[in-house]
Design a protein with these regions (language model features):
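A short beta-strand-loop-beta hairpin characteristic of the jelly-roll/cupin
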Residues: 1-18, 130, 134-158
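Ligand-binding loop in jelly-roll beta-barrel domains
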Residues: 13-20, 26-52, 166-180
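Short histidine-centered beta-strand/loop micro-motifs
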Residues: 33, 107-108, 125-131, 137, ...
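A short, N-terminal "cap"/entry segment at the start of jelly-roll beta-barrel domains
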Residues: 51-116
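Exposed loop/turn and edge beta-strand positions of beta-sandwich/beta-sheet ligand-binding modules
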Residues: 111-114, 133, 166
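Extended hydrophobic/aromatic segments used for targeting, binding, or gating
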Residues: 143-180
Length: 180
């Protein structure tokens, strides 16, 4: 979210900056260190799921994904490409799906975790839809945006984390002047 730094996972390391996304394999010690100024990271793991199901993380070297780094500049380029291509009425929304070579077939970053960056054009809406699993979202930019979840309006706020329960019918709306 803010700052820059370095992350070490096992024998690998990446240097990251504001807006970058990275995926780390389990089973390794991980160290995050800011460079000069304070950094803020938004971290999502499948550790709660593993604990709930009474499972252990993978053994060292047996993780279902590798260390992956998606720089903000490449993410921006891909989002712009999505807007260039456009979308038809049959498409629920515009999303950049992140995956890894090990999870490419399922379009996930982990066997049970999908990572996507959704975007709505100014004045746009995403039709009502539902997911079979929970959706955890980080609002990056959302002035005058909101979601309708099971008929209830939820206004967006920058850097807020939202949780949409499984099978809840929901839609997203941008009444602002910029894409979200």
């Amino acid at each position: 979210i803010q700052g820059e730094g370095k992350t070490v996972s096992g024998d690998e390391s990446i240097s990251w900056g504001c807006g970058d996304i990275f995926v780390l394999p389990g089973g390794e010690r991980q160290i995050h260190q800011a460079s000069k100024e304070m950094a803020i990271l938004w971290v999502v793991t499948n550790e709660p799921q593993l604990a709930f199901e009474n499972l252990q993380g993978p053994e060292k070297g047996a993780a279902p994904t590798e260390m992956i780094h998606y720089p903000a500049s490449e993410i921006k380029k891909q989002i712009e490409l999505i807007y260039k291509v456009g979308r038809g009425d049959d498409i629920a929304g515009s999303a950049l799906i992140f995956s890894s070579s090990m999870q490419e077939e399922t379009r996930n970053v982990l066997p049970t975790l999908t990572l996507a960056m959704n975007s709505l054009p100014a004045g746009g809406s995403q039709r009502p839809h539902r997911h079979n699993s929970v959706a955890v979202s980080l609002v990056i930019k959302g002035e005058n945006c909101f979601s309708m979840i099971d008929g209830e309006r939820k206004d967006w706020a920058p850097w807020a984390t939202t949780v949409t329960p499984p099978v809840s019918v929901h839609s997203h709306h941008n009444e602002g002047d910029e894409h979200s």
